Amino acid sequence: MRKTICSAACFCLLLVFAINAEEVRVETPANIQETIDDVLRDFYNKYSLPGGISMAISYREKLVYAGAIGYADKDHKIPLTPEHRMRIASLSKPITSIAVMKLVEEKKLHLHDEVFGDTGIFDGKYGIPEYENDSVKITVKQLLEHTAGGWGNSRRDPMFSVRNVTGDEFIRTVVKEYPLENSPGTKYDYSNFGYCVLGRVIEKKSGMSYEDYVKTHILKPCGIDGMRIGGKTSEPDEVEYIGVSGQNPYSVSPLHMDAHGGWVANPIELLKLLVRVDGFSNVPDILESETIKTMTTPSAQNNGYALGWSVNRSNNWWHTGSLPGTSTEMARSSSGFNWVILVNFRPGSAPEFSGDLDRLFWTIRTAIQEWHTGTEL
């Protein structure tokens, strides 16, 4: 049901969330809260979600909504709240991109640095990739753009097909046994493995673990203390993940997927990060404006993808994520709205699910014509 909301009408609903041991007070007019809750509830009911859906929205870099429908743990009847953390899957890729761009600003890294081979970032540690029996050079920028030439979703994704090896041996095995399908820099092919390698680039150039560098240099300046790389089990502040069609959410290891799909967060935390890399002026960004412009400029091989972000001609940036038991979206729009949606469920067969998830905010935007001031993030 669509409604037109006027910000002058009605009282405010005060919600207080304890995020990172600090209270986030969200004052949302009750009719706006009800309208958004109704949109989320319609989605929840349409797909008979066995878990729940949480969402946070900012306007002009202030929090205007944080809410959730459904369960964090249905078996124990624990309601979902925006405080509950979830695996965010590929929303981890923009986080990794932000970390790489911070290293570029620190002059510890260049986008055109070669990654493999004796003269590369790893000093030949992992060998060198081959294309048609010839050694090739892959750059940091190509990994960010998914144009490295191989290891993509269109064929075999080595992140999920190479088993029983981890760490350095895992990367060495992939480079040796998975020759490239294309010359680097010539074709887009979405690659989880490429972002796994970027995590190791961050470690090499920073002298810190990937997780520690991101926490110290990206999240802490945003006032975020609770995000982490997940594990095979759920922590007390984390939801239970629900698998369908024989999928076991706890068979995947977020630790192995750290830089491409391993982070655990709640929607307010992600929004706090997003408003500090969105290029708007109300909240200071943690990256310089030219760095953000570079990060969100589409590649020559795919005008819909930049460096870790999907982009379009409307100057909107976003990313989606999907794992067994997880569906996610994070977006920045040129109109001043940012939003994060997290679901602790992924359907086995529902081709319209991701499209409906993406349309949630636009349905809300159509229903609400005027917005209140919001709360500092």
Which stretches of residues belong to each language-model region?
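Short active-site loop at a secondary-structure junction
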Residues: 47-54, 76-142, 182-191, 258-261, ...
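Catalytic-site signature segments of enzymes, centered on catalytic residues
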Residues: 130-132, 154-235, 261-271
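Active-site helix/loop module of the DD-peptidase/beta-lactamase fold
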Residues: 87-90, 105-151, 204-244
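The feature captures the short pre-catalytic strand/loop hairpin that immediately precedes
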Residues: 75, 170-181, 241-255
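Alpha-helical scaffold elements that line and support the substrate/ligand-binding pocket
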Residues: 55, 60-62, 87-110, 114-115, ...
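Bacterial N-terminal signal peptides that target proteins for export
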Residues: 1-9
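Bacterial N-terminal signal peptides
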Residues: 8-16
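Catalytic loop of the DD-peptidase/beta-lactamase superfamily, centered on the K-T-G motif
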Residues: 22-68, 203, 220, 248-377
